[in-house]
C-alpha cells in the first residue's frame, strides 16, 4: 500500500483538512497517473495545479516550440525559452515546484499512431488540445480503453467544461457531433481566462481521482466571463454515436485482455 512521506504530509496538510479528503484522498492522488494534452495556457496551468496537489505522475504531451505570442498565458514558460520545445520547460518548472512527483514528456502531438499507448499509460486524461483532430482522437481512445477524460475548451471570453466517463456519460462526439471551423492563430485568448478554466479543469480531475466531491458528470458547464455567468446544461448519451454508441466498432473489437483499470473513482 502506498504511503505518504513526512514531507508530503506537511506539503499537502492544508488540502487534507478539506471535508471528505484526508490522507486517503491524498494517497489516491499520489497513486494516480494523469495524461495532459496540449500543454499551453490551458493544459500547462492545469498541470501546475495537479502537480502542486500531489498527483504522483504526469504525462505531458505537446508538439511544437514556444512562440512569443504564447507568453501572455503559458505560466510554466520563461522568455528565454521562446523557440524551444515548450513541453521540456513545462517539466523543468513543475519539477522545481514539486520534486516529489514524476513527470514524463512527449514532444509530439496526439496522433492515431500514439494515442492508444498514451491513454493506456494513464488513469485518466485532460483534453486541453488546441484542435478538434487531437480532441477526437483522444476521446475515441478514452472510450475504447474505458479511461475518464476531462474535456475543457475556450475561445475569447467563453469556455466550457465537462467530465466524460465512458459507458456512463456522453462522449465528446455525442456532445459535438458537428465540429466547428477552427484557425489555430485566429482565436483570441486572455491568460486570465485560460487560467480560470485550467483551475476548474484541474479541480475536476482531483474530484474524479479522490472522490471527495462530485464531478461534472453528464453536465456541460458553460462560462461567459464577460458577464461572469456560469450555467450547467444536462447532457444525454447518443445511443447511435459512432464512438460510444451501442453499435460502435470498439464494442466488437475488445478482448478479455484489454487493460481498462483506473485509479479514478466516481459516483
UniProtKB/Swiss-Prot annotation:
Family annotation (Pfam families): ThiF (PF00899)
GO terms for cellular component: cytoplasm
Name this protein carries in UniProt: Protein HesA, heterocyst
Keywords in alphabetical order: Heterocyst, Nitrogen fixation
GO biological process: heterocyst development; nitrogen fixation
Keyword Transmembrane recorded: no
Family, as annotated: Belongs to the HesA/MoeB/ThiF family.
Disulfide bridge positions per record: none
One Gene Ontology term of the molecular function aspect: ubiquitin-like modifier activating enzyme activity
Origin: domain of life: Bacteria
InterPro entries given in the database record: ThiF/MoeB/HesA, ThiF_NAD_FAD-bd, Ubiquitin-activating_enz
Amino acid at each position: 500500500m502506498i504511503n505518504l512521506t513526512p514531507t508530503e504530509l506537511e506539503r499537502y496538510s492544508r488540502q487534507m483538512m478539506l471535508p471528505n479528503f484526508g490522507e486517503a484522498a491524498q494517497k489516491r492522488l499520489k497513486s494516480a497517473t494523469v495524461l495532459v494534452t496540449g500543454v499551453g495556457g490551458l493544459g500547462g496551468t492545469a498541470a501546475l495545479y495537479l502537480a502542486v496537489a500531489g498527483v504522483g505522475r504526469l504525462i505531458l504531451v505537446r508538439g511544437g516550440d514556444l512562440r512569443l505570442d504564447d507568453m501572455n498565458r503559458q505560466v510554466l514558460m520563461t522568455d528565454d525559452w521562446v523557440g524551444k520545445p515548450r513541453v521540456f520547460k513545462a517539466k523543468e518548472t513543475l519539477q522545481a515546484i514539486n520534486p516529489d512527483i514524476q513527470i514524463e514528456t512527449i514532444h509530439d502531438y496526439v496522433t492515431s499512431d500514439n494515442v492508444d499507448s498514451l491513454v493506456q499509460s494513464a488513469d485518466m486524461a485532460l483534453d486541453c488540445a488546441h484542435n478538434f483532430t487531437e480532441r477526437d482522437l483522444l476521446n475515441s481512445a478514452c472510450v475504447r480503453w474505458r479511461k475518464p477524460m476531462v474535456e475543457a475548451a475556450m475561445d475569447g471570453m467563453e469556455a466550457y467544461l465537462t467530465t466524460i466517463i465512458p459507458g456512463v456519460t456522453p462522449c465528446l462526439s455525442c456532445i459535438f457531433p458537428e465540429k466547428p471551423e477552427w484557425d489555430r492563430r485566429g482565436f483570441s485568448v486572455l491568460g486570465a481566462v485560460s487560467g480560470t478554466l485550467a483551475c476548474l479543469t484541474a479541480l475536476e480531475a482531483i474530484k474524479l481521482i479522490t472522490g471527495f466531491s462530485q464531478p461534472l458528470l453528464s453536465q456541460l458547464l458553460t462560462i461567459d466571463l464577460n458577464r461572469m455567468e456560469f450555467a450547467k446544461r444536462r447532457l444525454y448519451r447518443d445511443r447511435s454515436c459512432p464512438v460510444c454508441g451501442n453499435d460502435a466498432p470498439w464494442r466488437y473489437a475488445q478482448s478479455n485482455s484489454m487493460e481498462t483499470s483506473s485509479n479514478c473513482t466516481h459516483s
